[in-house]
């Protein structure tokens, strides 16, 4: 199996999105506006609270608050519809490409001992690519655009506040996912490969059930299946534990950066650089705007498995057929057929060893 970098896998998968670029652009626009509506729900509520304390009117802000709340639902629906439309259309396209490739590789590929691995690849590996197409491409762009807008908004109160916000977004949305990817290493690929081997083993057991029963090997076979299943469960548990750890780290970072924003804002207020309104609004804005970058942080774990699945599918598509199909037939004089040093063996048993043959 060829081990590609995650970047190469991403480029290969993104190449399929070209035909749906407009829908992807629509998902990004709807997502950005939707997240801004959700963020400013909290920010406007903070503004209203300040107006109440100062005994000032806030009717226009209340209307804006209601509008943001209503729009958020429609915008979120539109974004998800676009993302999943792209995902399921592309999954159908990928399945069509995979089955076309299997027809070229048949019968040699389908007659091998890794039939279960093929089943896992055609079904669950392709399904896992849905995470990439529906929950990766547009969320990355949405997080980038929303973060830039919020850095400008928070930085409007003071440059230092904007700098702290950019540090927070960068740490949670970029550094943590990179650490997750490095920490997980080949865990995702190993899990998907072992899952394919497990599926092959189970299918072989079903196909050879009569022989297994004939030689009274049923109990041993079941124990081996249990052993492989437990190994898969342990690998999955390691991945889930890693996900939980970094999700906890992300939540802690949100709290720490929000606290740091308030402390820095209060310090600037004591220095006379900003008003106290700026302290409250900048803190509220930061706390409310972590949604897009937290989504990226959580996504990093899922992408470990998704990239592994993408790598396996790309391996299949890159495989060359062992025998080329002759479409129009072949007419001609074959002459003498010669076989030189022909060998054939299974993993543990040699059948033919350097056979030489000449047929006139």
Where are the regions a protein language model picked out?
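Membrane-integrated ABC transporters
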Residues: 1-37, 54-60, 79-83, 87, ...
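Primarily ABC-family ATPase nucleotide-binding module
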Residues: 1-2, 317-360
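Short intracellular "coupling" helices and adjacent cytoplasmic loop segments at the cytosolic face
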Residues: 1-4, 82, 88, 96-120, ...
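An intracellular "coupling" helix at the cytosolic face of ABC transporter transmembrane type-1 domains
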Residues: 14-21, 104-108, 124-133, 137, ...
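Transmembrane helices of ABC transporter permease
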Residues: 19, 23-36, 68, 135-190, ...
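Alpha-helical segments in transporter systems
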Residues: 22-43, 47, 61, 65, ...
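Hydrophobic alpha-helical segments in the permease module
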Residues: 64-76, 169-172, 243-257, 276-298
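Cytosolic ends of transmembrane helices, especially the final helix of ABC transmembrane type-1 domains
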Residues: 213, 217, 241, 289-318
């Amino acid at each position: 199996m060829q081990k590609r970098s995650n970047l190469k896998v991403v480029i290969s998968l993104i190449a399929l999105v070209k035909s749906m670029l407009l829908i992807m652009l629509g998902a990004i626009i709807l997502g950005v506006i939707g997240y801004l509506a959700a963020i400013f729900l909290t920010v406007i509520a903070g503004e209203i609270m300040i107006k109440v304390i100062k005994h000032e009117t806030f009717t226009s802000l209340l209307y804006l608050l209601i509008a943001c709340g209503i729009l958020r639902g429609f915008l979120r629906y539109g974004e998800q519809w676009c993302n999943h439309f792209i995902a399921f259309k592309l999954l159908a396209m990928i399945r069509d490409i995979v089955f076309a490739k299997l027809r070229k590789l048949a019968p040699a590929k389908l007659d091998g001992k890794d039939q279960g691995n093929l089943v896992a690849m055609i079904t669950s590996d392709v399904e896992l690519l849905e995470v990439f197409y529906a929950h990766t491409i547009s969320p990355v762009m949405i997080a980038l655009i929303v973060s830039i807008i919020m850095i400008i908004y928070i930085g409007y109160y003071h440059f230092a506040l904007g700098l702290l916000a950019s540090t927070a977004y960068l740490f949670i949305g970029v550094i943590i996912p990179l650490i997750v990817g490095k920490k997980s290493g080949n865990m995702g690929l190993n899990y998907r490969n072992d899952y394919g081997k497990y599926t092959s083993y189970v299918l072989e057991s079903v196909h050879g059930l009569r022989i297994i029963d004939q030689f009274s090997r049923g109990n041993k076979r079941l124990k081996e299946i249990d052993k492989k299943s437990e190994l898969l469960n342990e690998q999955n548990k390691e991945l889930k534990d890693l996900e939980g750890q970094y999700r906890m780290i992300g939540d802690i970072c949100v709290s720490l950066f929000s606290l740091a924003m308030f402390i820095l804002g209060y310090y600037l207020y004591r220095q006379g650089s900003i008003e106290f309104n700026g302290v409250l609004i900048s803190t509220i804005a930061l706390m409310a705007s972590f949604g897009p970058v937290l989504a990226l942080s959580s996504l990093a774990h899922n992408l470990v498995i998704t990239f592994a699945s993408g790598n396996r599918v790309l391996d299949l598509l890159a495989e060359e057929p062992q025998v080329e199909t002759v479409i129009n037939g072949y007419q001609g004089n074959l002459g003498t057929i010669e076989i030189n040093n022909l060998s054939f063996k299974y993993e543990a048993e040699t059948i033919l060893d350097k056979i030489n043959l000449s047929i006139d």
